[in-house]
A protein has these predicted regions:
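The AdoMet/dcAdoMet-binding core of the Class I SAM-like
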Residues: 42, 46-171, 179-180, 190, ...
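Active-site beta-loop-alpha junctions enriched in small/polar residues
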Residues: 182-184
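C-terminal lobe and adjacent flexible extensions of AdoMet/dcAdoMet transferase-like proteins
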Residues: 217-226
Length: 226
């Protein structure tokens, strides 16, 4: 049996400890001994980006925000889907996570981050949202397990009314706001609707045909056509 290697540790501003592991060529980030994400399971992250970005493929000068770099799969799927003139802003709060992805020895997202369309920001995505009123055609937030249960307490505001309104304010007309979640959450879905959004809830698996089910919330301002 091949050993599990602990490669590095990061601590977020609220004290959450993230640990990077490698096993048999696959990488994972763990919190409290539990995989938060893995290079073996990223179908739902790919699906999130494809659902949000495919309708924008023919739109000129598209601007997209991704909250949370993770292991780079949402970013890579967005870049595969969007046009050459698109701009993708990625906000990641943990400098170590950025470093892991940029490390060519780990084969994670170094090539994607070097893409000329990418604007990588070492910052809390909440700060980027506050500074970006009316700037994005789409916002994808994959910064935690979803509204409940949170692994990082500092992410809570993003799933509350104030955070949802902040994200909505950062959208351009006809913009999309999407969230990745490990679980379904009827209360969060209702919070999106209470903010004046129409919401599509999509269930998708960690692998293309197997693995745990994850939930994607894809929201738009009510009354706008697709």
């Amino acid at each position: 049996m091949k050993k599990v290697e602990h490669l590095d540790t990061a601590t977020t501003p609220d004290g959450t400890v993230l640990m990077l592991y490698r096993h048999d060529g696959a990488y994972s980030i763990r919190v409290d001994g539990v995989d938060l994400m893995s290079t073996r399971r990223h179908h739902s992250e790919d699906t999130l980006a494809e659902l949000v970005c495919l309708p924008l493929r023919q739109t000129k000068d598209v601007r997209v925000l991704i909250g949370g770099l993770g292991l780079g799969f949402t970013l890579k799927a967005a870049l595969r889907t969007l046009a050459p003139d698109a701009r993708v802003v990625v906000a990641e709060i943990a400098a170590e996570v950025i470093g892991w992805n940029m490390n060519p020895d780990y084969n994670l997202a170094a090539a994607a981050l070097a893409d000329g369309r990418v604007d990588l920001r070492h910052d809390d995505v909440a700060n980027v949202l506050k500074q970006s009123r009316g700037q994005f055609d789409a916002i994808m937030l994959d910064v935690d397990n979803g509204a409940e249960p949170l692994t990082t307490s500092g992410n809570a505001q993003l799933y509350r009314h104030v955070g949802i309104q902040m994200a909505v304010a950062a959208l351009r007309p006809n913009g999309r706001l999407a969230y990745w979640s490990a679980n379904g959450d009827s209360h969060f879905e209702q919070s999106l609707r209470d903010a004046g959004l129409s919401v599509e809830v999509i269930r998708t698996r960690a692998h293309a045909t197997s693995g745990a089910w994850h939930t994607l919330f894809v929201a738009r301002l009510s009354g706008l056509s697709t």
